[in-house]
C-alpha cells in the first residue's frame, strides 16, 4: 500500500505548492497585456505575436538571476523586491537590443516551500513585469530539500521581447563623435554583491552610515534595480539611439564596449558621472582602488546611450529626467574605455 505521506517525509510539501499557486494568481493578473493566451497553470505560456502590431518582428530573449544579492534578502528577511531585480536584469538586457518586453517567466528553487515568502517573491516579479510592460505568463517553483537549506532559495528569470527588424540595436550604427548619455541607476542594482557582502560582513544592516544620507544600510543594499524600459522605448521607436549598454557585472570597462565595433572606444569624463553615495561608501569601507570601482559597479549609471549629436536635445526632451552627458565615442587607439 502506498504511503500518502512519503513525499512529505522526504521534505516536499505538495499542498504548500498548491497554496503558492493560489496566492500568486492575483499578482500575475496585474501583468496582463494584449497578446496573452491561456491561463496560469498550463504546461506552457502562450502569446499571440500578431497583437503587437510589429510588421517585421524579431524576437529577442534574455535570462538572468540576481546573484548573491539574494543572500542579503534572506539575511534581512525582505523578499518583496528581489523579484523586481530579476525582471530588471532580464528586460534591461533586451531593451539594449531594441526590444519591447512581451512576456516573462520565473524560476524559484527553494529548500522549503514557504507560501507567504514565495508570494512576496512573485509579487516583486509581478511589480517588475508591470514596470516593464511584460506579462508574467508562467514559471516554476521547485522545492529541493537537500539541495538548498530550508531558508534558502534561488531565483532566475527569462524575458522575451520583440523589435522591428529595422530598429534592432546591434552596435552597427554607433560612430565616432556620438555622444554618450548616462541614465542614473537606483543603486548597486544586482551585480558585485559578493564584494559588497564582504565589505559589510560585520554590519547588521541597521547602521546609518554618514555617506548614505540618512538611509539604513540594508535599505540601500536592497534597493531594487531600476527598470529602464518605459523611459527608453520611445527613443527606440523614434530611432534616436545608436547604441545602448546595460551596465551590469564588469561595470563600465566590460559593458560599454559591447555596444560598438572593435575599432571604436568610449572616452568618459569621470567628473560628469553621477556617482551615488553607496559607491563612495563601498570604496571607502572596502578600501577598493578607485579605478577598480569602474571595473565592478555601475557607479550611478545603469544604462548608457550612444546618440548622434543632433539628437541629444530630443532624447533629453523625451526622457524628462536628469540625463548626464558623460562622454563621446572616439577612434580606438589602445583601450576600449578611457576614463579621464
UniProtKB/Swiss-Prot annotation:
Listed EC numbers: 6.3.3.1
Compartment(s) where it occurs, according to its Swiss-Prot or TrEMBL record: Cytoplasm
Major location (coarse): cytoplasm
The organism's place on the tree of life at top rank: Bacteria
Keywords, alphabetical: ATP-binding, Cytoplasm, Ligase, Nucleotide-binding, Purine biosynthesis
Gene Ontology MF terms in the entry: ATP binding; phosphoribosylamine-glycine ligase activity; phosphoribosylformylglycinamidine cyclo-ligase activity
Signal peptide bounds: none
Pathway assignment: Purine metabolism; IMP biosynthesis via de novo pathway; 5-amino-1-(5-phospho-D-ribosyl)imidazole from N(2)-formyl-N(1)-(5-phospho-D-ribosyl)glycinamide: step 2/2
Reaction(s) this enzyme catalyzes, per UniProt: 2-formamido-N(1)-(5-O-phospho-beta-D-ribosyl)acetamidine + ATP = 5-amino-1-(5-phospho-beta-D-ribosyl)imidazole + ADP + phosphate + H(+)
Alphabetical GO biological process terms: 'de novo' IMP biosynthetic process; adenine biosynthetic process; purine nucleotide biosynthetic process
GO cellular component: cytosol
Recorded family membership: Belongs to the AIR synthase family.
NCBIfam families: purM
PANTHER family, per database record: TRIFUNCTIONAL PURINE BIOSYNTHETIC PROTEIN ADENOSINE-3 (PTHR10520:SF12), TRIFUNCTIONAL PURINE BIOSYNTHETIC PROTEIN ADENOSINE-3-RELATED (PTHR10520)
Name the record gives this protein: Phosphoribosylformylglycinamidine cyclo-ligase
Gene: purM
